[in-house]
Amino acid sequence: MNFISKISLGAKVFYAESLEKLLSNMSVAKPTIMTAVPRFYQNLYTKILLSFSKQKGFKKKLIENTILIGKKNLNKEKLSFKQKIINFLCEILVRRKIKNQFGGKLKAFVSGGGALDKQIGEFLNSIGLPTLQGYGLTETSPVVSCNIPGKIKIETVGPPFKTNEVKISEDGEILVKGENIMLGYWKMKKETDNIIKNGWLHTGDIGEFTKDGNLKITDRKKEIIVNLGGDNISQSKIENLLCLYEKIKQS
């Protein structure tokens, strides 16, 4: 359905052959939007960092400023006159070259299917690769919310789409209601009744709304560990931190 919906809007859909051939594939496809799971962006982050670590002198300093000022831009922080000049140089000498490596027309990377580490999201945005987090399930056809280019809040999955209504239950679970919700599982009434109650789909995800109306996923309902002291411990946060290490691919 996701594939067909894009074609119906007049878009062309390309699939990368492999991670190793990604850049060559993108130079041919020249995508405007690319979607992938967080692990892809973790691998991309590691590879770019490795490439940056080999630079010395002026190039190294330029890259450091690109990341530093890029993060300030992302967080809407005010730049000094000197930083504006440096940022202009970074845009021409660093970000533009990186964008061209990915086809030159990329408007956004969209991450879904799991939590994207904030450090990775900030880094990719800072070097000229707009990276958004989205949220959805197969049962919601599939997108519930997504960040908006120019208004990116990395730690959130953006505001809910107008096609659905989202609320947080008393125990913190994200509930979704709208025309995009499935009718039910095929010939599985019991399972359907367990997940859809009074028109609300119980996602199994724990979340909250930020002050600006963005949805923030904090954990999976079934993946929270309660220790002997009664503390709630998030497995996913620990797993994401472990995956930042080059030698750890999955945790």
Task: Report residues per predicted region.
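Active-site glycine-centered loops adjacent to acidic/histidine catalytic or metal-binding residues
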Residues: 113, 136, 158, 205
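C-terminal boundary motif of the adenylate-forming
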Residues: 206, 245-251
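Hydrophobic alpha-helical segments in the ANL/AMP-binding
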Residues: 1-9, 120-122, 143-147
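Conserved AMP-binding/adenylation subdomain of ANL enzymes
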Residues: 1-95, 105
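Conserved ATP-binding/catalytic segment of the ANL
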Residues: 160-227
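Active-site loops of AMP-binding adenylate-forming
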Residues: 116, 125-130, 137-155, 188-191
